[in-house]
Regions:
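Macrodomain-like recognition of ADP-ribose-binding/processing modules
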Residues: 2-160
Length: 160
């Protein structure tokens, strides 16, 4: 549990098992019991940048649903935003953690933190490959371990 000076925010790893239950962000985000939650999805670089360069364009590619947990991408374009993407690759996953990749991840996490604080969300869900939350859950892109570890570290240190 990470805390800010104003409130406590729970950062919760979530494992996808099957559609229509916990772990399925597309289902969870529609349930009343998750109305105080913000969801982090794995984004591709092109759509991540499209949204961040023009967040006011609900018809743009940065607001279109994607595969896997990016099905909730349109929720980052709603008011208030209920989701935010962290880029995990371009046409395939980032293989290594270079400065460009770090910068994109840092930009995403900063925006997510700002949105969570501004909208008083109590919980943040991110996709994990296990309940211990040590590694990012990925399905479509094959993302390098150091990249996945960096993303999880940044998510977990948002309120430090």
């Amino acid at each position: 549990v990470k805390t800010t000076t104003k409130k406590s925010v729970f950062i919760i790893p979530s494992v996808f098992k099957s559609p229509g239950k916990e772990g399925d962000f597309g289902w969870m985000i529609k349930q009343e019991e998750y109305k105080d939650a913000f969801f982090i999805f794995n984004d591709n670089e092109e759509q991540f940048l499209a949204h961040h360069n023009n967040p006011e364009d609900p018809k743009g590619i940065g607001c279109q649903p994607g595969g896997g947990n990016a099905v909730i991408r349109p929720c980052q374009c709603k008011i208030p935003p209920r989701a935010g993407g962290i880029p995990t690759g371009t046409v395939s996953g980032y293989k290594r953690l270079d400065e460009k990749t770090k910068d994109l991840i840092d930009k995403a996490v900063s925006q997510i933190l700002k949105t969570v604080i501004e909208n008083n969300y109590q919980r943040i869900y991110f996709s994990s490959d296990s309940k211990d939350g040590k590694s990012l859950g990925t399905g479509i892109f094959k993302v390098g371990e150091e990249v996945k570890e960096y993303i999880v570290k940044k998510i977990n240190s948002m309120f430090d």
